Amino acid sequence: MGLWIQNFKQALRGLRHQGWQAVVSVVGLAVSIVCLTFSVNWLWTETHYDSFRPGYKDLYVVEREDSLEHTESLLYRWGDRVSSVLGEEAMVGMYRYQGGRERVYLPDRPETVFYAQELSASTEMVALLGCRVLSGSLEEVAAADNRIVLTETMARKLFGRIDVCGESVCHIQKWRQLLYTVGAVVEDCRGKSNLHYDFISPLWVEDYERNSAVHENFRIMVRTSRPERTESELSRVDIKDSYPMGKLVLTPLRMFHKMGDGSGFVRAYFYQLAFVAVSLLLVLSAVVNLLAVYTSIFLGRIREYALRRSLGA
C-alpha cells in the first residue's frame, strides 16, 4: 500500500512536470465549448425571430408556389378565399408590403418630424400578432377606418406618454398627407422581427385592387397550431384563375427571412448548421485529447509501479 501511495505521488509530480500539456488540453476544451455555445445560440437566434410575440411558433406567412416562382405577394381577393376556407381552423390577417420608413408628426407641431416604419394591416392582423395593448382597445380601432395603432416607443416620441387615445397624428405617405386618430398603443417589437413596425395603419384597399388579377400588393398571415392540416386546407383555395399550376403554402414567420424564398431548412441555415457541426467536432477532439494526455501521464506511472513490483522494489 505504501508503494502504491508513493507511485501515486510520483504520478502527481509527473503531472506537474507535464502540466503544459494538460493546460493546453483544458484551454482547447474551453475554447471549443465557447465555440459550440456561440454556434448553438446563433442557430437558435436565426430560427426564432419574433420570439417576443405570444405563441410566435404558430404564426405563418402564406406564400404562392409553382415551378417558376415562390413569393409572398398575393392578390387581395385571395385573402377572403383563405379566410372562408379555413374558417375556425386558423386566424387570418392581411397586410401590405412594407416599404421604407415614412414621416409622421403632430398637427400642431409640423416642424418636428419623425421617421417611422409603417405596417398597413387589417384589425384581424393586429389581434393575430398577439400585440399586448397598453392603452385604448382594438375594438376602437376596428370601429373606424381612420384609427391607427402606435407602439409604446412611437407614442413616447410623439407625445411623451402612452395614454394618447383620441389624439391626432399626421402621416405623409408618398404624395399624400393623411390624418389619423390614435386608437390604441401596443408594446414594442422587443427583438429581431420579420415584421417590424412603429405604427399600424388601416388597410385601405383601392377599388382597382379588390378584383385585380395583376396587383399582388398584399400578404396573408395565419395563426394556427396545426400547420400541416392548415396547409392541406389551403389546397382548396382557388387560385387557378391566375396561376393554373400554383398552390398556397405556409412558411413560419420566425424563419421567413431565410426560408421565404422557398429554401429548405438545411439550405437556408447551412452556415449555422455547419458551424454547429464543426464546434461539436472541436469539443469531441478536445475531450479525446484531454483524456489522452491525462491517461498517458498516469499510465506511465502505473507502468513504472508495475516494473518496480516485478523487480521486488
Q: Language-model features: where?
A:
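Short, strongly hydrophobic transmembrane alpha-helices
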Residues: 10, 14-46, 57
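Mid-to-C-terminal secondary-structure elements
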Residues: 121-137, 146-266
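Conserved structural-core and active-site-/substrate-pathway-adjacent residues in large, well-folded domains
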Residues: 15, 82, 126, 151, ...
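Structural preference for long, well-ordered alpha-helical segments in enzyme cores
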Residues: 11, 30, 42, 78, ...
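Membrane-helix entry/capping segments
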Residues: 1-8, 12-17, 21, 235-281, ...
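Intracellular coupling helices
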Residues: 6-16, 20, 24, 288-313
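Alpha-helical transmembrane segments of integral membrane proteins
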Residues: 21-35, 272-292
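Structured, solvent-exposed hinge/loop segments at the ends of secondary-structure elements
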Residues: 36-165, 170-178
